[in-house]
């Protein structure tokens, strides 16, 4: 399919390109696994990386990978069909994460956190299996900001996400090229291009992450007073002033 090359397309492409350049996310010879969940974010990321690849000053490969967590009703076939139709190299993996979560999860533990850890490990393994040195994930600007607030409000830590970092396995570099792209733009871009969005079919999807939903609501309220609040919060992540913080480890 040919993407609709309107002003929105150009804005997203420019912001992805800016993130890649500023943080050195892609280098010559990279083989990048893109985690494609079937959601709007990962489709946008995949198509943008492929678009930029065609005119990039460096040569890199893009490989689409998907982890089926085993939730009943998940339509992996729809994702696979879209990827093949658009000429992507595709690797799909079926797991029984759903069964593992049902068996191992404690009543007081988060369903989402266990699922995320299992899926992350599977993505790392699949990327390594197919000789990919980098794993691209579809976290966008709103995810960075919401994570910053969640960690401050509920964890007591001043942290969010990194646009690029070495994974815990010490082998795979995780990159997040959508750091400058808003969720609002991604929603519209996905609609414009009619991406076949697939629900993960998790039994608690849409109800479990109440804290993140509250952060979205809070930001929406604050935007009424300050339309630039998201840009300001994102800018704060790149403007850390250690002398004005309390962490003794930062003192020279």
Swiss-Prot record:
GO-annotated molecular function: 4 iron, 4 sulfur cluster binding; ATP binding; metal ion binding; transferase activity; tRNA binding
Pathway(s): tRNA modification
Cellular localization per UniProt: Cytoplasm
Reactions it catalyzes: cytidine(32) in tRNA + S-sulfanyl-L-cysteinyl-[cysteine desulfurase] + AH2 + ATP = 2-thiocytidine(32) in tRNA + L-cysteinyl-[cysteine desulfurase] + A + AMP + diphosphate + H(+)
EC number: 2.8.1.-
One of the protein's GO biological processes: tRNA modification
Domain of life: Bacteria
InterPro entries: Rossmann-like_a/b/a_fold, TilS/TtcA_N, tRNA_Cyd_32_2_STrfase, tRNA_thiolation_TtcA_Ctu1
Binding locations of [4Fe-4S] cluster: 112, 115, 202
CC per GO annotation: cytoplasm
Location of the motif PP-loop motif: 37-42
Required co-factors: Mg(2+); [4Fe-4S] cluster
Keywords: 4Fe-4S, ATP-binding, Cytoplasm, Iron, Iron-sulfur, Magnesium, Metal-binding, Nucleotide-binding, RNA-binding, Transferase, tRNA processing, tRNA-binding
The record's free-text note on cofactor binding: Binds 1 [4Fe-4S] cluster per subunit. The cluster is chelated by three Cys residues, the fourth Fe has a free coordination site that may bind a sulfur atom transferred from the persulfide of IscS.
Role noted for this protein: Catalyzes the ATP-dependent 2-thiolation of cytidine in position 32 of tRNA, to form 2-thiocytidine (s(2)C32). The sulfur atoms are provided by the cysteine/cysteine desulfurase (IscS) system.
Cited HAMAP family: TtcA
NCBIfam families: PRK10696.1
Extra facts: The thiolation reaction likely consists of two steps: a first activation step by ATP to form an adenylated intermediate of the target base of tRNA, and a second nucleophilic substitution step of the sulfur (S) atom supplied by the hydrosulfide attached to the Fe-S cluster.
Family: Belongs to the TtcA family.
Assembly and oligomerization: Homodimer.
Protein name: tRNA-cytidine(32) 2-sulfurtransferase
Organism: Geotalea daltonii (strain DSM 22248 / JCM 15807 / FRC-32)
């Amino acid at each position: 399919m040919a993407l609709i090359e309107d002003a929105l397309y150009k804005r997203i492409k420019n912001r992805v390109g800016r993130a890649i350049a500023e943080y050195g996310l892609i280098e010559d010879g990279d083989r990048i696994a893109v985690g494609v969940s079937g959601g709007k974010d990962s489709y946008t990321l995949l198509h943008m990386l492929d678009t930029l690849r065609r005119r990039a000053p460096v040569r890199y490969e893009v490989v689409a990978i998907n982890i089926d967590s085993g939730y009943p009703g998940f339509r992996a076939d729809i994702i696979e069909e879209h990827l093949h139709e658009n000429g992507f190299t595709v690797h799909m993996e079926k797991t029984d994460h759903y069964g593992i979560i049902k068996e191992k999860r404690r009543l007081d533990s988060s369903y989402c956190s266990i699922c995320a850890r299992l899926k992350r490990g599977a993505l790392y393994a699949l990327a390594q299996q197919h000789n990919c040195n980098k794993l691209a994930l579809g976290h966008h600007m709103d995810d960075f900001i919401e994570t910053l607030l969640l960690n401050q409000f509920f964890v007591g830590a001043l942290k969010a996400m990194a646009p690029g970092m070495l994974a815990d396995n010490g082998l795979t570099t995780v990159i997040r090229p959508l750091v400058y792209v808003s969720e609002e733009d991604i929603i519209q871009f996905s609609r414009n291009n009619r991406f076949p969005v697939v629900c993960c079919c998790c039994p608690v999807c849409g109800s479990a992450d109440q804290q993140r939903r509250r952060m979205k609501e809070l930001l929406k309220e604050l935007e009424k007073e300050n339309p630039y609040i998201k840009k300001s919060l994102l800018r704060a992540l790149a403007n850390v002033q250690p002398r004005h913080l309390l962490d003794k480890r930062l003192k020279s």
